[in-house]
Amino acid sequence: MNFDLKTLELAAAAAEKCDLLLVLIPEGFTPGQDALSTLAALALKNGDLLLKAGKHLQLYQVPAVAARRVILLGVGDGTARAVRQALLALGAEIKKPQTKRLVLCFAAALKAGVASAAVQAVAEASYVYTTTKSKAEARSLSRCVLGVPDAAGARPGFDCGVALVAGVEFAREWSNRPANHATPSLLADAAKTLGRLPHIQCKVHGPAQVRRLGMGAFVAVARGSEQPLRFIELRYSAAAKDQAPIVLVGKGITFDSGGISIKPAPEMDEMKFDMCGAASVLGVFRALGELQPAINVLGLIPACENLPDGRAIKPGDVVTSMSGQTIEILNTDAEGRLILCDALTYAARFKPAAVIDIATLTGACVVALAGVRSGLFANDDDLAVSLYEAGEAALDPCWRMPLDDDYADGLKSHFADMGNTAGRSGGAITAAKFLQKFVAGMRWAHLDIAGIAYKSGPAKGATGRPVGLLVHYLLAQAEAMAQQAPVAPAAPAAPAAPAARPAAKRTGRSQGGLKRTAP
């Protein structure tokens, strides 16, 4: 699908030839004298249109309007959140087969984040998964035009939104694929395709290399599957070489049966989504390739299956992690933290500015936060605030959870340095406390996305979250780093003329000012 941005007032929008013209009208709308304004004013006066977000009035073959259909759409207070809500409420109309060309016309100036939110909402509403269907109907919408009062002012947000659509849909695609179509090897192949984008390189480690690295916990989880593990390493390098990278670590369990501690059969099919953390890292890199911010980012994805087999780990087994710490496997279904702990240890060698792991880690987080917010755990307050603010800006929110030391008491083991689970109570927190044992000396955050990575029921499928949160965080960090870049010294002043001589005539020489240089 193609997105276009243009300056378009309501008067000119009437001449736009399209299958569907959406006129987005906020509260406090002041109508003009054009056909669409008159139409909206009459609908409001007669009570046929309300401006609460999502309320709408659909019209056909409107005189003096070129569009086949017109929908007057209320967008409430006109904020990014309200615009997103309104467009998603109209998803069925956007997704109709006859809607191939869509024009969105904003009846008032855009508020912060609206252009990006609108692009993403249209993409989400029209998304169709087709990869493993023999006769699937592909997305019918081929072009969407955003008509705004000031295209130049909306351009940065629009471009960010288009890049986020690319990243989110890449993540959704790989999350939605069945496990036999998204094995660790296939996931690694997907990562390699990202290496074609600007500033991105990809390296894939196989089982022998992972064993040589000493990733005993990761190797132990993968033993029960015939599919070989993969450790994926993505690098986005667009800043100075000496700038410390931000590391993203994504959990890549491409199917989680629970292992010997096997899960109940109902809804086990959804355990293909246990690699949504990995998919979100891939999605972030896809977006970075479009946006090309001046920052260094490293993506690490430990990918494997968790299956029962004669070689699989058993409850009571003790394994040695890459850090040298030993772990008693009390529950083989607490496997995500085992592959993450080795990846976190590996991340330390890059001396990162921050490390963020992303994982569908615990059902306890779903109980705590449902499908609204990711669970955020962090050992650094500034990092936690930055991620929270990024989530709010991206409409991809998270909520900080506690990390009191007392929560780690349940991880004590009689036979190893720690157990891999501490029971049901506070399960999301104790899982984070386990990971915290492997991030000494690093600024670290953990996003538990078990509740927000995918949906069950009639709308079953991956959401692509938290790609938006992570990209907004990285863009904010790139901007902050650019502002902190060293200031070039001013050119030395010309020597003063000798006092005995007459003053020289002043020329039109330009004077060099202070110049900020990007890292």
Swiss-Prot record:
Coiled-coil ranges per UniProt: none
Cofactor binding note of this UniProt entry: Binds 2 manganese ions per subunit.
PROSITE patterns the UniProt entry points to: CYTOSOL_AP (PS00631)
Residues covered by region (Disordered): 487-519
One Pfam family per UniProt: Peptidase_M17
Catalytic reaction equation(s): Release of an N-terminal amino acid, Xaa-|-Yaa-, in which Xaa is preferably Leu, but may be other amino acids including Pro although not Arg or Lys, and Yaa may be Pro. Amino acid amides and methyl esters are also readily hydrolyzed, but rates on arylamides are exceedingly low; Release of an N-terminal amino acid, preferentially leucine, but not glutamic or aspartic acids
Gene Ontology cellular-component terms listed: cytoplasm
Domain of life: Bacteria
InterPro entries in alphabetical order: Leucine_aapep/pepB, Macro_dom-like, Peptidase_M17_C, Peptidase_M17_leu_NH2_pept, Peptidase_M17_N
GO molecular function, one term: metalloaminopeptidase activity
Residues that bind Mn(2+) 2: K251, D256, D274, E335
Binding residues annotated for Mn(2+) 1, in chain numbering: D256, D333, E335
Extent of Low complexity compositional bias: 487-502
Cofactor(s), by name: Mn(2+)
Compartments reported by the entry: Cytoplasm
Biological function: Presumably involved in the processing and regular turnover of intracellular proteins. Catalyzes the removal of unsubstituted N-terminal amino acids from various peptides.
Family of the protein in this entry: Belongs to the peptidase M17 family.
Protein name: Probable cytosol aminopeptidase
Organism: Verminephrobacter eiseniae (strain EF01-2)
